[in-house]
């Protein structure tokens, strides 16, 4: 998830809902190094044991990774997190606190984050507590492998991405996965129109680029002959 929001009660309310994710949380920041991610020698344990003892890194087991100040994520860390996301298991929530649109995630990492949520314009009074029932989530996860996405639905998502000038092939695949998840959450057996609309809003909308404006035809020079007089 790419979560664009300043630190505050609105963002906290959404993050609290992630307690229903059955994965341990791991907090990351832009200065997180390779030893923290992949593990390394535990000096204290090595000295105490008299032999080399290695400590496991954050990526050793599937986890819910929370990357704070994601707009400052350096290219190296972005590449390592992207590699981790390419394998099944980890979930990443990138907390983008950028003040302007120019302050944003590295493109390679943003491409791997399927869902985009922007809370900058959301006031506390417009929110309500998000309560995710653990049993319902477990049932939805159990249904998910059997959820079907018809060919015409996948074609509609691909066509929508093309019309929005989205060149990434990940986008329609991520949108299809989001639509299947939405169908599982509402207890359906196949993807429906409402699931496609939700997937398009969360996965495709922020990636689209407006079509170039048509340029007006140049005006003829003042000394051009008047064709009406010929």
Question: Which residue stretches match the model-derived regions?
Answer:
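Amphipathic alpha-helical interaction segments
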Residues: 156, 173-178, 194-198
């Amino acid at each position: 998830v790419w979560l664009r929001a300043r630190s505050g009660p609105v963002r906290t309310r959404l993050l609290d809902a992630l307690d229903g994710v059955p994965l341990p949380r791991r907090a990351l920041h832009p200065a997180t190094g390779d030893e923290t991610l992949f593990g390394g020698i535990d000096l204290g344990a090595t000295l105490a044991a008299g032999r080399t003892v290695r400590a496991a890194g954050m990526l050793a087991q599937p986890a819910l990774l929370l990357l704070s100040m994601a707009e400052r994520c350096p290219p190296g860390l972005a590449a390592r997190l992207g590699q981790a996301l390419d394998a099944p298991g980890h979930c990443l929530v990138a907390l983008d606190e950028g003040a302007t649109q120019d302050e944003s995630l590295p493109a390679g990492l943003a491409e791997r984050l399927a869902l985009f949520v922007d809370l900058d314009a959301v006031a506390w009074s417009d929110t309500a507590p998000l309560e995710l029932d653990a049993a319902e989530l477990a049932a939805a996860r159990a249904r998910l492998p059997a959820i079907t996405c018809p060919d015409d639905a996948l074609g509609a998502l691909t066509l929508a991405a093309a019309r929005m000038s989205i060149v990434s092939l990940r986008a329609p695949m991520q949108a299809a996965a989001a639509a299947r998840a939405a169908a599982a959450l509402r207890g359906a057996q196949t993807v429906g129109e409402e699931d496609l609309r939700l997937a398009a809003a969360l996965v495709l909308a922020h990636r689209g680029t407006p079509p170039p404006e048509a340029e007006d035809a140049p005006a003829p020079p003042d000394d051009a002959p008047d064709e009406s007089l010929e």
